[in-house]
Amino acid sequence: MKRLLLPLILLALPLMVYAENSTPRAEWVMTKPSDKNKAAAEFLKTGIYPATYGEASLSFIHKKRVAKSTLNDKGGAQAESVKGDYWLFEMPAENIPAGTVVDFWTQLNTSPTEENHRFALEYLDGKKWLPAMPLDKDGGNYTTTTSDKHPRRLWCAIRLSKEIKKGNIAFRLRQVEDKPLTVTVHNPSPRGQLNQMVCYKNVEARDTLKYLFIGNSYTYYHTYPMIFKEIAWHEGHYADCDIFISGGYTMKAHLSNKYSRAVVAEGGYDYAFLQDQSIQPLLNGTPDDSGITENMGKMIEQVRKYSPQAKPVIEITWGRKHGNNALGKYEYLLEKYPQFFTDYETMQARLIEVLTAEAEQFGTELSPVGIAWRIVRRERPDIELYWKDAHHQSYSGSYLAAAVAYQVIYRTPFGENAANAKLDAKTAAYLRSVAERVVLQGER
């Protein structure tokens, strides 16, 4: 088989000992190509440890010459695929003990769209490729149905039975159906939301709960659900997560999207985190209210219908950094409702008021991320919670959201081996302490 290798640059890192709370990870972050005529964009590789050599890579392995295979800053890595072809994700690793759990996340589109397509997701354990999930009678374990606008997420965790002294952690997505396909594996992003592998410490989880995340870019920037999963693991809990996210999506949009509805209808969830578009709650009760509370109620009904045991969780999001910035298509609201956009504090207070009332009305849990956000801004302005666009969350912001979500579910102080993820220990500890103060002590 021929290999089309799409290289990623690995930053040189010193040797680090694999400690109980260290988290080897691979993330692919895209940069714009220096020459747009080149077939492949340049990539920047960040955050791997304790790996000290080699390159992380995304490869397409195929039986014959592909018709098209490019990287670009909009679509992704694309190839014409036939049965037996596969995408290969590799992360260099050293001294990874047997029993390590590896969490893998990516997103892809398949064409023809609006059809079910079958793949086998596998991982390398020693010298053997093993199914990441049980295979069915056709040799597959993963079905994707996508549209042009809505990629399908692929998120799973496996446990390695073999030690890796020096080698690669590897996953592959192999086509099992005969029909030729066009497969696009979505680009790594500077916002850090796609194509990741994270290794968890070698422990046995005390319990397993199944989670659903329904949201938008305030969910997927820096993958706060993945950080939540990492935090839970270090505290001894396995979070089995599913997700449907699309930028700018409101609850109304989720209700009308068949892919979003299908994820909800899979059922079996213990908790469902519901995140409305960040401007919508401000408009509650105004002439521009398009049924904001009603639509949240309908989504809660759907969750309870397919997962009767589930506890829906409404998330309080955060205000824009300056209150009136980065409004995009909602810019016209500044003149109509200036009282909501005076500054950050004004916007945040309105979000807290409306979303708290929604949770009370529908009898749901509440994830008070916005309250914790406000405390951090007041106490530690040196911790930048925002991405450079001044409204999406930075990695620190995602970590805070994940820590609050963890406290909402488990309501117990973090242990002494809590996960810091990519943050320095002092910053992570402070953000966790704020999550505890807000959820466990009711601080506002």
Predicted regions and their residues:
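Bacterial Sec-dependent N-terminal signal peptides
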Residues: 1-22
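Extracellular carbohydrate-recognition regions
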Residues: 19-53
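Terminal, low-complexity interaction segments
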Residues: 30, 129, 138-203
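Surface-exposed, low-complexity/disordered Ser/Thr/Gly/Pro/Asn-rich loops and linkers
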Residues: 49-98, 191-193
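Extended, low-complexity, turn-rich repeat/linker tracts enriched in Gly/Pro/Ser/Thr and Asp/Glu
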Residues: 95-98, 108-117
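Conserved catalytic region of serine esterases and O-acyltransferases that act on ester linkages
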Residues: 207, 385, 389-396, 402-444
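Conserved SGNH/GDSL esterase-like catalytic core that processes O-acyl groups on lipids
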Residues: 210-212, 218-302, 308
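Alpha-helical cap/lid subdomain in secreted, periplasmic
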Residues: 263-391
